[in-house]
Amino acid sequence: MRNTTTDRTTAEAAPDYLFESGSRLGAVHLDALSTVLDRHTLSVLDALPLPEYPRCLEVGAGNGSVARAIAERTDGEVLAIDLDPGNLIGGTRVEVRQHDIRDSVPGGPYDLIHARLVMLHLPEREQILPRLVEALAPGGWLVLGDISEMPAAVALPEDGDRAVWDRYAHAAYDIVGPQAGQSYAWASEMYERMLDAGLRGVRAEAYRPLTRGGDTSARCHVNLSIQGEGPLLRAGLSAEDLRRYREIMRDPRLRAWFYEVVYAWGRRPVPRGQTA
């Protein structure tokens, strides 16, 4: 089910993200992320003491898997927004809307706002965080998940693959990502930033699964290398290194740590004398 509304300012804006979530490759990428990350994401969300029938906002909703799960588990209403909702599927009590969170936080107040792998892509993240907090109802929860560590190879198939791995990592994470405005330091700063924004009961934890060559997380890396091929080559990575990197990711002998994803969450205070 896809009932999509479009905010005028978003439709007129030119998207400048490195990856296109609404494309065919984007759909494969989003499905892989859902497979790898959703179980842990939902374990964090399930532990929150939400009110009955909560109002929720899912920022950068991707394919909508988390938004649909929130609606199903809480019986609440979920607004699922994305800059490119081409692969965003809604559902019962899930409204899909094209919207750029850099422009504003739509609607509210919310009992839950969740954003996974969103803020690290936004150079305006420091300005967006207080707006998200302001959009929470008293007692509402903000949950953020972002990448803090890059993939780390444990066992590689062939001699010489370590050099290929390192050259790819340099091009992708030292050049292409930062040029696109990505911050890999943000995840380690979220806890303190949430406290600074006035949230209470702030907690954080990290999640990092092991990748095996050819599995879903490895295919996710291959997909990203295809979407980012142009910028990677312009950053100095050779076509041969790119080809070999994809072979490594498909080789069942590979063992590597996936991205480390840090989740941080906190609650907007309830004014004295008021109940959440």
Predicted regions and their residues:
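Class I SAM-dependent methyltransferase SAM/SAH-binding core
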Residues: 55-57, 61-104
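A short glycine-rich, Lys/Arg-flanked "PGG" loop and its adjoining helix->strand segment in the class I
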Residues: 126-141
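Conserved catalytic/acceptor-binding region of the Class I
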Residues: 143-215
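Conserved alpha-helix/loop element of class I SAM-dependent methyltransferases that forms part
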Residues: 35-52
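A short SAM/SAH-binding and catalytic strip from SAM-dependent methyltransferases
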Residues: 111-126
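A short acidic, Gly/Pro-enriched loop at the edge of an enzyme's catalytic core
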Residues: 103-113
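Class I SAM-dependent methyltransferase Rossmann-like catalytic core
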Residues: 13-38
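C-terminal helical/coil "lid" or tail adjacent to the Rossmann-like core of SAM-dependent
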Residues: 25-26, 167, 202-256
